[in-house]
């Protein structure tokens, strides 16, 4: 089909397939992920319907986890309720195992374990759930065992909520990533080294492009040249945890980009509002 172009983009293949391909054909292989994710970044109306179904299922699981949360159970026991609800409702799989409690909430990105949850612990999680129809529900919340935040937990929670609310208020179709990153909410110095890797990322069949990295001091750590476009679906991220601190707060919500701003797809309330 293209005799003068021997470049072939491949998404996924096993090693044997690659060996056979290179043996039989004179091709230059490149990673197809960035091209595929760019093509998937603008969602159709049908895709949004599928995504909303996945989010609805995820939030059922989140409510069940909040109802079941109690001191004496393990992180893995609590996390199992998310899997139960996803499978019961025709869902598929989870990208990660991000549910942690107490001191394991700081720093972020530790994997779910058999640690026993204690009275008053924060319990933070990221759904990363591929639900019904194969679309991802990517929502983060931080619960507290006993349903009552102490003063320090409230302080961290309020900062994380301010982080989310400020950043989501900036985004609309046409906004450049660099302008957004420059105007985005900045963590205090004692939290900077614990920052989440990105401010926002795309979401579809899994976590996808676009991605706006959490900026370093001179914005040299990533490519900020693209723009937000209408019907992109994105997640706005926040993690607030002081370096060396006891606990941390993880929040994340899912949105669709419009010409007038963001339309929120996730609806689970924040702990500070319940």
Regions found by a protein language model. Give the residues of each.
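Active-site neighborhoods and metal-handling regions in enzymes and metal-associated proteins
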Residues: 1-274
